[in-house]
Structures are given as C-alpha cells and as structure tokens.
Amino acid sequence: MIKNYADIIPEVTELAKLCKNNTISPDLYTKYDVKRGLRDLNGKGVLTGLTEISEIISSKVENGVEVPCEGILTYRGINVKDLVKGFIQEDRFGFEETAYLLLFGSLPNSTQLDSFRNILGEYRQLPPGFVKNI
C-alpha cells in the first residue's frame, strides 16, 4: 500500500495542539523590544530568549567585568551536556527525545516517546521508487 505522506493522522493533530498552546505573549515583543524579522533596525540579530526553547551562556561577570566563559547550551532549561551524557550512559541515540523536548517543552515519558517514535517512523519511510528515481 502506498503511503500518502500528506495525510495528517490524529496523533499529529493532537501534538500540533500542544505546540499551539506554547506561544509567546505579544506583549513581550514590546516589553523587550524584540523585532519580528531576523534583524533589528541597527542590523543586530533579534533576541531569541523569549521562546525559552534554548539558551546560550557565553560569558560571566567577574569583578564587575563581563568575561568569556566555557559555553553552556540548554534546551528548555536542560543542559545539553546532561542530555547527551544520559543518552551515552543508557546507550541510546536520543534524537526523538530531544526533538520532543524542543517541540513540546518537556522530555517525554515512555508512553509519549513510543507514540512519538511510531509517528516519526510512519513519515520516515521513503516512497516506492525513490532510490530508483534518484
């Protein structure tokens, strides 16, 4: 049976609702002077911190002076090094868990992870004749 890759299955619709509830208040754009394009009027990159999806810490204050430090990258408040360490210790890849975390704001429980993996698996299959047509 040929899979229609444009089909939206009910599970995807439910997950999309989670993303819809994860929006940024329009008031915060004004409060923090965040522009809605990729650059502000001065050519600087826009602030991405409102999203709380990721944070990069690249400096610290020492004796009142901001100095570079070993960088820290967090996804949804979780240090990426800790995520990777867990994946390595438990001998798993972690792609699906990380994608779920970034999309929906928290790490999945085992039931959510199994469901998410199944959904991704359904859309991961190549259409018939793909390799032949390349």
Where are these regions (language model features)?
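Hydrophobic alpha-helical bundle cores within soluble ligand-binding/oligomerization subdomains
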Residues: 1-134
